[in-house]
Amino acid sequence: MEGDIAQMGQFIGAGLAAIGSGAAAIGVGHVAGNFLAGALRNPSAAAGQTATLFIGIAFAEALGIFAFLVALLLMFAV
């Protein structure tokens, strides 16, 4: 009985940690959407901002990967 409760806690914790992957997708959408809005307002400055766009997307995706790793650790290592 106690093992079942511990396993249930692992699954709940992993599910909550996996929510971060969805938050990363929302973050990437915001970064790309704001870049597109700025590029449409000032097309001449858009070429200089693409590096910043990719850095922002990389940071947002890194948070999603960290959330996924935490979920895996909660599932299999704890």
UniProtKB/Swiss-Prot annotation:
Instruction: Provide the Gene Ontology terms for cellular component.
Output: plasma membrane; proton-transporting ATP synthase complex; proton-transporting two-sector ATPase complex, proton-transporting domain
Q: Which Pfam families match?
A: ATP-synt_C (PF00137)
InterPro entries the UniProt entry points to: ATP_synth_F0_csu, ATP_synth_F0_csu_sf, ATPase_proteolipid_c-like_dom, F/V-ATP_Csub_sf
Location comes to: Cell inner membrane
Q: Which GO terms describe its molecular function?
A: lipid binding; proton-transporting ATP synthase activity, rotational mechanism
The entry sums up its family as follows: Belongs to the ATPase C chain family.
How it assembles, according to the record, is:
F-type ATPases have 2 components, F(1) - the catalytic core - and F(0) - the membrane proton channel. F(1) has five subunits: alpha(3), beta(3), gamma(1), delta(1), epsilon(1). F(0) has four main subunits: a(1), b(1), b'(1) and c(10-14). The alpha and beta chains form an alternating ring which encloses part of the gamma chain. F(1) is attached to F(0) by a central stalk formed by the gamma and epsilon chains, while a peripheral stalk is formed by the delta, b and b' chains.
Report what the protein is called.
Answer: ATP synthase subunit c
Species this protein is from:
Jannaschia sp. (strain CCS1)
